[in-house]
């Protein structure tokens, strides 16, 4: 379990440094699909400070930190540079990766950040089109020109710079063109991922900034489809079976845990919806934290919610959290039966 990885200094953490974001991506967990100009009502706006980070990690015993965001972009975190510097200065081998839309700050900021992280830092910029119209149909509120300038600045350093493209029908024929465009700015590493919030069908409707209904469409080219697995992360949508034979936890396989911007240590991003139940007491809870996709909250998840102080880095250290019976035993035991596993565990990590 995770405690073994921590004791061996092999644990990796995905840390959400902020819930602030400059973009309005329709399928993002923070975005109100009925008005993309707004965030979800329940989501608090906060960010991790350098003092928070030092308190959470007085000793750096983590193999890799990944700064991304289910609810925010790490580029919006005011203390991003001092946090990266703290990790570099207080560890010998710990590596860092940062996933960002890149349409904030200026070239000097990203150049300086790479100067701090050097070979131990990877920046992953999101580029979703060959022009502003294509790029911003999904990556709304961002400037492709600004992203490319920031990419070019980062590529002048010894840090690794990558580009990630989220694939939809509107850009699936332009993936090679997007990558060739980015090569001109110095990028050598590329990755793609399907837009994967297509649970009920191949279209995703949302209301744009002008109050008009728009729709994202799922990729149609079979040679682009990535199927059930992508780098050991399971992707579920309407195309895939719902029955499974066993649960193989992708987060455990990757030696990974999530840390929210409020300091909660959570097994994976799919279970991060339990934060809504903790911080926002009204409204319907997410199906992922139930047992069968509806009804009451899964008992194991309810225990986490009731005891959330025990999983908060403001109250416990990471060593105590991964040694807690909930992490060391209970969650694994829950995977043995459809009647005890959470809906998220079955839906996302159930092998057909």
Residues of each region from the PLM?
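Radical SAM enzyme [4Fe-4S]-AdoMet core and its adjacent flexible, acidic
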Residues: 16, 36-48, 58-59, 112-321, ...
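Sequence-level motif detector for i,i+2 pairs with an aromatic at +2
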Residues: 8-10, 221, 340, 346
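Conserved alpha-helical substructure of the radical SAM core
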Residues: 1-122, 133, 137, 141, ...
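Hydrophobic side chains within well-formed alpha-helices
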Residues: 109-110, 318, 341, 345
């Amino acid at each position: 379990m995770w405690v073994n990885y921590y004791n061996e200094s092999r644990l990796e953490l995905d840390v959400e440094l902020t819930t602030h974001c400059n973009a309005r991506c329709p399928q993002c967990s923070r975005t109100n699909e009925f008005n993309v100009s707004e965030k979800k009502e329940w989501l608090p706006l906060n960010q991790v400070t350098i003092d928070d980070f030092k308190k959470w990690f007085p000793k750096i015993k983590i193999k890799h930190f990944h700064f991304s965001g289910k609810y925010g972009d790490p580029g919006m975190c005011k203390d991003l540079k001092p946090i990266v510097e703290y990790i570099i200065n207080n560890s010998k081998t710990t590596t860092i990766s940062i996933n960002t839309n890149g349409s904030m700050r200026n070239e000097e900021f990203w150049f300086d950040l790479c100067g701090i992280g050097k070979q131990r830092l990877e920046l992953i910029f999101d580029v979703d089109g060959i022009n502003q119209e294509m790029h911003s149909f999904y990556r709304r509120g961002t400037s492709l020109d600004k992203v490319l300038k920031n990419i070019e600045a980062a590529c002048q350093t010894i840090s690794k710079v990558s580009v990630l493209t989220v694939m939809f029908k509107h850009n699936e024929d332009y993936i090679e063109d997007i990558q060739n465009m980015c090569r001109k700015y110095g990028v050598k590493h590329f990755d793609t991922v399907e837009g994967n919030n297509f649970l009920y069908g191949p279209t995703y409707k949302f209301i744009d900034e002008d109050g008009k209904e728009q729709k994202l469409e799922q990729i149609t080219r079979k040679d682009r489809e990535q199927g059930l697995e992508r780098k050991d992360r399971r992707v579920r949508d309407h195309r895939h079976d719902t029955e499974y034979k066993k649960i193989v936890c992708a987060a455990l396989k990757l030696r990974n845990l999530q840390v929210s911007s409020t300091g909660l240590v959570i097994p994976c991003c799919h279970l991060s919806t339990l934060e809504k139940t903790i911080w926002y007491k009204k409204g319907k809870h997410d199906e992922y934290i139930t047992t069968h996709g509806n009804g009451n909250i899964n008992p194991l998840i309810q225990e986490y919610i009731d005891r959330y102080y025990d999983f908060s880095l403001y109250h416990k250290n990471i060593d105590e959290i991964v040694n807690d019976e909930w992490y060391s035993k209970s969650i694994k035991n829950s995977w043995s039966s459809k009647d005890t596993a959470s809906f998220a565990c079955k839906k996302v990590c159930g092998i057909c």
